[in-house]
C-alpha cells in the first residue's frame, strides 16, 4: 500500500469533474454563508495556524466542519494544519475531498501536491502543482512546491527563482523563506541565505524553540562563511586515485588536513551533505567552533545531536587539495574502530567520484562544468546534459545511469523497489553506513513483519547507540535494473530524521548492498552509475557488519 492512495482518488476526481462540468454546478457553494456566520471562529483558526498552534487550528477547523461538512474553506485550512504537522495522509484526504466537490480549486490541488511531495511521490505531486497553476497562475503553494522539486533534483537556479516568487506572493508564509534560505545556501549565496533565515525568524511562530535555535546557529555560521573569500577551492591535480581500507563495508580514506603531515582516517559518507570531524580530533588539531546552535536530526540514540560548526583551512585527498572546508564537530559513538571524520558530499561534489568496492580504490575526476540545471531527469524526460561550451557530455560506456535527488538536509536519495511493495521508496544512498536500513513506519505500513529475523542488533548512529534493534531479511532490493536478494536490514525509527529531509525517506542503502558494485557519483548531472562486481571482488573486513554503523 502506498502511503498516499493516489490512484483510486484520481479516478473519482475525473468522474466528479465530468459531472460538475455537465451540470454547470461549479461556482458558489454553501461554504460562503457558513463563512459569514462563523467569521470569528474562522479568524481564530487562521490566527492559530499563523501562530504555529497547529493542533489548535486543527481543532477549530474541525469544529467548523462539524457544523457544515461542505465548508470547503475550513477543510482546506484543516488540510494545511495537518500538513504542517506532517499528518500527510489526513492532509491529502481533506484536500482530495474538496477537489471532489470543487475540481477547479487551485488551492486544493496545491495542498494535495504538497502532501504527495512530502510523502516522496514526485511524479504525482508535479501533476497536481501544474494543475493548480493552470487554474490560478499565482497560487504560491504550487509555485513553492515546484521550486522544491527543482531543489531536490539539484536545479538550483530554477528553485531559487520559484521560491523568490513564492515569497513575493505570500511574504507572511515562513516556510517559503526557510526553503529559500536552504536553496541559496546550497548554491553558496551565503548572504542571501542568512538574510532569508533572519526574515524567517522575524515572522515564524515562536512555538518551535529548537528549530529557532538551530536557525540562529546556522545564521551565525552563514555570516562567517560569507566573510570567507570562497569555499571548497580546488588546488593540486584535477584527478587522483587512492586505495581505501574497507571496514564494515565502509570506505576509509587517508586524509591530511590543515597542511599537516599526519594522515587521518576519514569515512567516505554520501549520507552527509557536510563533512564531520570528531570532537577528539578537533581538540588535537586545535580546531575551535566558529558557531553553534540547536540540534540536528539523525539515526540512533535520541535521534538528535548538538550542532557545532567548525572550519578547516584545507583537506588533502591523494593529489587533490580542497581549501576552506566547513565541517560539523561532534562526538563519535563507535569506539570499536576509531576514525577521525567523515567526508561529506560538498567536498566531492565538484568531481565525478568513483568507489570500486572490488579492488578498494577511490577516484576523483574533475570535469568541465555543465550548463546550469542540466540534469538527467527521473523518467528520462530531461534534456541531455551539456558542458559550459554547449557540448553534449557522455557517460561511461557499459554503465547505467540512475537519477538521484538531494534531500533538504543534504542526503543523496534514490528510488528503490522492494519486493512486496508496489510503489518505489526513497532510500538514502549512504557509503558511510555499514548496513541497509528500513524505517519502522515502512515495516508497519507494508506488513514486512513476516521478514523480521529472530536476532537483534546494536547500531551506532550519529545521534547515539540504538540497542535491541530488529532486523529484517528483504527478499529482493532493486536499484535501477540491479537486484540484490536476501538483503539484511536494520529496522530503525526514521521519523526524527524525516523532520528535516523535506520528503520522506523510507530507508538507507548501506554498505552491505553497495559493496557489490563499482559506483560513480556524477553530482553535476544528478546521477549515479553502477557496475556489478565479478566473483573476484574482495570482501571487506567484518563484511557481515555484526555491529553496524549508520552515520
Regions found by a protein language model. Give the residues of each.
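Short amphipathic alpha-helical segments that mediate assembly, nucleic-acid/protein binding
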Residues: 10-11, 15, 211-215
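Solvent-exposed, amphipathic alpha-helical segments
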Residues: 41-48
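Compositionally biased, intrinsically disordered low-complexity regions used as flexible
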Residues: 1, 24-32
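Bacterial N-terminal signal peptides
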Residues: 14-25
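Pepsin/retropepsin-fold aspartyl endopeptidases
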Residues: 30-35, 43, 55-59, 63, ...
Amino acid at each position: 500500500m502506498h502511503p498516499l492512495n493516489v490512484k483510486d482518488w484520481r479516478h473519482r476526481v475525473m468522474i466528479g469533474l465530468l459531472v460538475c462540468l455537465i451540470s454547470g454546478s461549479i461556482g458558489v457553494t454553501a461554504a460562503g454563508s457558513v463563512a459569514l456566520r462563523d467569521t470569528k471562529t474562522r479568524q481564530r483558526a487562521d490566527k492559530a495556524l499563523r501562530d504555529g498552534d497547529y493542533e489548535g487550528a486543527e481543532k477549530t477547523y474541525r469544529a467548523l466542519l462539524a457544523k457544515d461538512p461542505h465548508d470547503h474553506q475550513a477543510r482546506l485550512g484543516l488540510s494545511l494544519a495537518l500538513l504542517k504537522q506532517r499528518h500527510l495522509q489526513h492532509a491529502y484526504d481533506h484536500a482530495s475531498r474538496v477537489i471532489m466537490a470543487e475540481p477547479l480549486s487551485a488551492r486544493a490541488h496545491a495542498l494535495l501536491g504538497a502532501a504527495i511531495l512530502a510523502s516522496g511521490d514526485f511524479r504525482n505531486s508535479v501533476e497536481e502543482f501544474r494543475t493548480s497553476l493552470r487554474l490560478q497562475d499565482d497560487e504560491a503553494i504550487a509555485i513553492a512546491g515546484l521550486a522544491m522539486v527543482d531543489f531536490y533534483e539539484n536545479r538550483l537556479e530554477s528553485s531559487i527563482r520559484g521560491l523568490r516568487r513564492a515569497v513575493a506572493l505570500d511574504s507572511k508564509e515562513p516556510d517559503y523563506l526557510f526553503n529559500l534560505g536552504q536553496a541559496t545556501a546550497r548554491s553558496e549565496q551565503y548572504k542571501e541565505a542568512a538574510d532569508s533565515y533572519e526574515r524567517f525568524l522575524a515572522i515564524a511562530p515562536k512555538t518551535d524553540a529548537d528549530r529557532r535555535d538551530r536557525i540562529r546557529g546556522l545564521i551565525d555560521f552563514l555570516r562567517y562563511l560569507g566573510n570567507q573569500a570562497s569555499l571548497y577551492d580546488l588546488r593540486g591535480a584535477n584527478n587522483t586515485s587512492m586505495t581505501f581500507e574497507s571496514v564494515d563495508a565502509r570506505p576509509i580514506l587517508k586524509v591530511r588536513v590543515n597542511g599537516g603531515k599526519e594522515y587521518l582516517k576519514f569515512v567516505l559518507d554520501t549520507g552527509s551533505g557536510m563533512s564531520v570531524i570528531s570532537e577528539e580530533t578537533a581538540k588535537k588539531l586545535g580546531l575551535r567552533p566558529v558557531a553553534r546552535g540547536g540540534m540536528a536530526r539523525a539515526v540512533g540514540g535520541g535521534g538528535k545531536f548538538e550542532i557545532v560548526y567548525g572550519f578547516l583551512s584545507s583537506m588533502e585527498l591523494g593529489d587533490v587539495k580542497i581549501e576552506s572546508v566547513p565541517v560539523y564537530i561532534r562526538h563519535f559513538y563507535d569506539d570499536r574502530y576509531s576514525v577521525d571524520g567523515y567526508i561529506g558530499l560538498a567536498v566531492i561534489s565538484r568531481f565525478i567520484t568513483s568507489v570500486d568496492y572490488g579492488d578498494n580504490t577511490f577516484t576523483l575526476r574533475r570535469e568541465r562544468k555543465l550548463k546550469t540545471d542540466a540534469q538527467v531527469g527521473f523518467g528520462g524526460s530531461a534534456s541531455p546534459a551539456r558542458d559550459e561550451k554547449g557540448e553534449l557530455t557522455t557517460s561511461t560506456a557499459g554503465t547505467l545511469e540512475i537519477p538521484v535527488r538531494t534531500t533538504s538536509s543534504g542526503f543523496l536519495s534514490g528510488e528503490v523497489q522492494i519486493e512486496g511493495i508496489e510503489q518505489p521508496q526513497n532510500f538514502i544512498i549512504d557509503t558511510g553506513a555499514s548496513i541497509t536500513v528500513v524505517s519502522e513506519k515502512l515495516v508497519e505500513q507494508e506488513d514486512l513483519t513476516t521478514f523480521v529475523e529472530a536476532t537483534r542488533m546494536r547500531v551506532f548512529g550519529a545521534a547515539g547507540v540504538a540497542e535491541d534493534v530488529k532486523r529484517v531479511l528483504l527478499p529482493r532490493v532493486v536499484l535501477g535494473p540491479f537486484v540484490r536478494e536476501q538483503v539484511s536490514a536494520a529496522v530503525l525509527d526514521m521519523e526524527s530524521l524525516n523532520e528535516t529531509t523535506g520528503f520522506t525517506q523510507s530507508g538507507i542503502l548501506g554498505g552491505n548492498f553497495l559493496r557489490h558494485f563499482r559506483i560513480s557519483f556524477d553530482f553535476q548531472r544528478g546521477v549515479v552509475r553502477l557496475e556489478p562486481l565479478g566473483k573476484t571482488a574482495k570482501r571487506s573486513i567484518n563484511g557481515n557488519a555484526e555491529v553496524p554503523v549508520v552515520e
